[in-house]
C-alpha cells in the first residue's frame, strides 16, 4: 500500500477525541437533574396543567489525584494543576477533593467555590515511587466515595492500577501513549496547539 494511503488509513483508525471534552462529559453526567414544582414547566400552562420543571443541581463533587512520583517533573505538576483550574472554571459550584500521591497521599484538600483561590498556592508533594493503590486505600480509610475520580499521571504504576469496583475512574495520562488502564477510562493528555 502506498505511503500516502497508509497515512490516510492511520488517520482514520486513530480517532482523536478531545480529552478535556471527555472529562467534561463525564463530570456533566454526575450532575443531578430532577423534577420540581419550584420551577414549573411553562409548556403545560396553555392547557391549564401545571407540570414540574427541571431542577438542575450544578454542583460537581469529584476527587482528583495528582501523581507526584519521581518520574513527574515540576512542569507536569503545573500542567496538571492548570487542568484542574480549567475544570473549576467550567462550573459555578464545585467541590473537589484534591491530593497528591506517590506511595502515600499528601496535601489532601477540599477545594470549593468559596476557597478556589487556594488552588493557586497548592503545593504538590511527593517524589518517591508510584503506588496507585494508595489512592483507593486513602479514600476507603477516609470514607470518601466519589462519583468520579480523576487521576493525572504518567501511567507507570508500580503494581496495580487500583480498585475497579470502588468508583468511576478516569486516568489522564501524560507522556505515555501506550498506557491503558485495565478499568475506567484512559485518556491521553495531548497539549493543544
Predicted regions and their residues:
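Acidic, polar low-complexity linker/tail segments
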Residues: 3-63, 72-75
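Conserved P-loop NTPase mechanochemical-coupling segment
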Residues: 33, 122-123
Amino acid at each position: 500500500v502506498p505511503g500516502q494511503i497508509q497515512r490516510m488509513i492511520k488517520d482514520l483508525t486513530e480517532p482523536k477525541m478531545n480529552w478535556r471534552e471527555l472529562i467534561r462529559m463525564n463530570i456533566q453526567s454526575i450532575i443531578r437533574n430532577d423534577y420540581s414544582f419550584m420551577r414549573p414547566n411553562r409548556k403545560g400552562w396553555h392547557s391549564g396543567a401545571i407540570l414540574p420543571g427541571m431542577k438542575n443541581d450544578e454542583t460537581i463533587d469529584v476527587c482528583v489525584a495528582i501523581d507526584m512520583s519521581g518520574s513527574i517533573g515540576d512542569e507536569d505538576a503545573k500542567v496538571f494543576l492548570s487542568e484542574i483550574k480549567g475544570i473549576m472554571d467550567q462550573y459555578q459550584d464545585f467541590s473537589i477533593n484534591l491530593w497528591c500521591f506517590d506511595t502515600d497521599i499528601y496535601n489532601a484538600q477540599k477545594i470549593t467555590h468559596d476557597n478556589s483561590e487556594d488552588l493557586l498556592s497548592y503545593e504538590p508533594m511527593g517524589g518517591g515511587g508510584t503506588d496507585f493503590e494508595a489512592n483507593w486505600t486513602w479514600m476507603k480509610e477516609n470514607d470518601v466515595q466519589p462519583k468520579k475520580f480523576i487521576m493525572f499521571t504518567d501511567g507507570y504504576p508500580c503494581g496495580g492500577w487500583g480498585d475497579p469496583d470502588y468508583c468511576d475512574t478516569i486516568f489522564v495520562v501524560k507522556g505515555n501513549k501506550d498506557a491503558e488502564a485495565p478499568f475506567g477510562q484512559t485518556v491521553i493528555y495531548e497539549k493543544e496547539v
